[in-house]
């Protein structure tokens, strides 16, 4: 795959950088949540970190044939203060992607007829909507000094779709069967 338009390529690199940082940040915050006796919130962070990894990999793969050094600039929350603040940082990051970043990237890819970029931006946007809700639910529980009450978290390995529904049969975003999902 190769991207013909510089703007879409820049957006893919930016999204790759942002998703890569979210992946690492969520792994760190997941460990901290577990160490603070919030194992389910920790597991949620780790599951969503896997989803962010999938998004980064999808963006990377669209640019796979465009090999060269590039500076990647992406906004990110840094630091770690406490569970409530970490969850707020996660919520803010997801909302930024939902309301600002991915809608612009997606429309640009459509306009420039970059089908693979359009697909990967769509996958990420749809998953981020779920992530924001799950992080909000986790924060609501943590504000009451409670761990979130969840079972397994399932992640689609193709698009990063995230669900708590153990009865789902296939991914509603990309169609992959649930038996391929990663469970956390």
UniProtKB/Swiss-Prot annotation:
<feature type="binding site">
    <location>
        <position position="52"/>
    </location>
    <ligand>
        <name>Fe(3+) 1</name>
    </ligand>
</feature>
<feature type="binding site">
    <location>
        <position position="128"/>
    </location>
    <ligand>
        <name>Fe(3+) 2</name>
    </ligand>
</feature>
<feature type="binding site">
    <location>
        <position position="52"/>
    </location>
    <ligand>
        <name>Fe(3+) 2</name>
    </ligand>
</feature>
<dbReference type="InterPro" id="IPR048574">
    <property type="entry name" value="RUBY_RBDX"/>
</dbReference>
<dbReference type="InterPro" id="IPR024934">
    <property type="entry name" value="Rubredoxin-like_dom"/>
</dbReference>
<feature type="binding site">
    <location>
        <position position="94"/>
    </location>
    <ligand>
        <name>Fe(3+) 2</name>
    </ligand>
</feature>
<protein>
    <recommendedName>
        <fullName>Rubrerythrin-2</fullName>
        <ecNumber>1.11.1.1</ecNumber>
    </recommendedName>
</protein>
<feature type="binding site">
    <location>
        <position position="19"/>
    </location>
    <ligand>
        <name>Fe(3+) 1</name>
    </ligand>
</feature>
<dbReference type="Pfam" id="PF02915">
    <property type="entry name" value="Rubrerythrin"/>
</dbReference>
<dbReference type="InterPro" id="IPR009078">
    <property type="entry name" value="Ferritin-like_SF"/>
</dbReference>
<feature type="binding site">
    <location>
        <position position="174"/>
    </location>
    <ligand>
        <name>Fe(3+) 3</name>
    </ligand>
</feature>
<feature type="binding site">
    <location>
        <position position="97"/>
    </location>
    <ligand>
        <name>Fe(3+) 1</name>
    </ligand>
</feature>
<keyword id="KW-0520">NAD</keyword>
<dbReference type="Pfam" id="PF21349">
    <property type="entry name" value="RUBY_RBDX"/>
</dbReference>
<keyword id="KW-0575">Peroxidase</keyword>
<feature type="domain" description="Rubredoxin-like">
    <location>
        <begin position="151"/>
        <end position="184"/>
    </location>
</feature>
<feature type="binding site">
    <location>
        <position position="131"/>
    </location>
    <ligand>
        <name>Fe(3+) 2</name>
    </ligand>
</feature>
<dbReference type="InterPro" id="IPR012347">
    <property type="entry name" value="Ferritin-like"/>
</dbReference>
<dbReference type="InterPro" id="IPR003251">
    <property type="entry name" value="Rr_diiron-bd_dom"/>
</dbReference>
<dbReference type="GO" id="GO:0005506">
    <property type="term" value="F:iron ion binding"/>
</dbReference>
<keyword id="KW-0479">Metal-binding</keyword>
<feature type="binding site">
    <location>
        <position position="171"/>
    </location>
    <ligand>
        <name>Fe(3+) 3</name>
    </ligand>
</feature>
<keyword id="KW-0560">Oxidoreductase</keyword>
<dbReference type="InterPro" id="IPR052753">
    <property type="entry name" value="Rbr2/Nigerythrin"/>
</dbReference>
<dbReference type="GO" id="GO:0016692">
    <property type="term" value="F:NADH peroxidase activity"/>
</dbReference>
<dbReference type="InterPro" id="IPR009040">
    <property type="entry name" value="Ferritin-like_diiron"/>
</dbReference>
<feature type="binding site">
    <location>
        <position position="156"/>
    </location>
    <ligand>
        <name>Fe(3+) 3</name>
    </ligand>
</feature>
<keyword id="KW-0408">Iron</keyword>
<keyword id="KW-0249">Electron transport</keyword>
<keyword id="KW-0813">Transport</keyword>
<comment type="function">
    <text>Functions as the terminal component of an NADH peroxidase (NADH:H(2)O(2) oxidoreductase) when using NADH:rubredoxin oxidoreductase (NROR) as the electron transport intermediary from NADH to Rbr2.</text>
</comment>
<feature type="binding site">
    <location>
        <position position="159"/>
    </location>
    <ligand>
        <name>Fe(3+) 3</name>
    </ligand>
</feature>
<feature type="binding site">
    <location>
        <position position="128"/>
    </location>
    <ligand>
        <name>Fe(3+) 1</name>
    </ligand>
</feature>
<feature type="domain" description="Ferritin-like diiron">
    <location>
        <begin position="2"/>
        <end position="146"/>
    </location>
</feature>
